[in-house]
């Protein structure tokens, strides 16, 4: 079995693969104060609860956008699984040609998503990842990573509204049936959710224009991350939601580097 970990700003997403099949996906809260032992105990509990024997895990791969937790995560893997993990970064084979001004500055999660999407679709792509930040990435048919855009995530956008406007309450992020709303909560939901959908569709339309101008043709638009389902319901530009895109990318990269 293969153990894949994607450490984000809010959550660490864990996956267990048996061959090419994802047999377990679960999450831990990201906490820089947590020790390797604390992470180890939590991970072993999750595996035990799902009837997975740690001795069956033969490889581990990690991607992270949170540098200050990496010592604990890597030490946890070595101590509790007796495995040296592959860590996505410089020197790791991805099959993606990064056309960024400084390739080392691209977030590991963005590269991992690009690897998965290119392996799955082999066509011009726009990849949207709805995480703590929302990222937009453009990938060519042959696998060149062109770059993209980074925006505040929908939760960050909502939190800014709650914190800066004293009389506005915290709300659940759901899509109301109308934009013309009759109460404060629904009005806020409409503004945040429909406003974010508008942002997505406009940014994607601009990326499409630029990719077409480069001769790539019309890109296929895929979305992943916690709010992909909510936004895709109303978006005019998202073609497909891939909820486990990052985990799949880690599996593909592991296969390229395990020899």
Swiss-Prot record:
GO cellular component: cytoplasm
Kinase in keyword set: yes
GO molecular function: ATP binding; metal ion binding; pantothenate kinase activity
EC number: 2.7.1.33
GO biological process, one term: coenzyme A biosynthetic process
Cofactor-binding details, from the entry: A monovalent cation. Ammonium or potassium.
Pathway where it operates: Cofactor biosynthesis; coenzyme A biosynthesis; CoA from (R)-pantothenate: step 1/5
Source species, domain of life: Bacteria
EC category: transferase
Family: Belongs to the type III pantothenate kinase family.
Name of protein: Type III pantothenate kinase
Organism: Clostridium novyi (strain NT)
Phylogenetic placement of the source organism: Bacteria, Bacillati, Bacillota, Clostridia, Eubacteriales
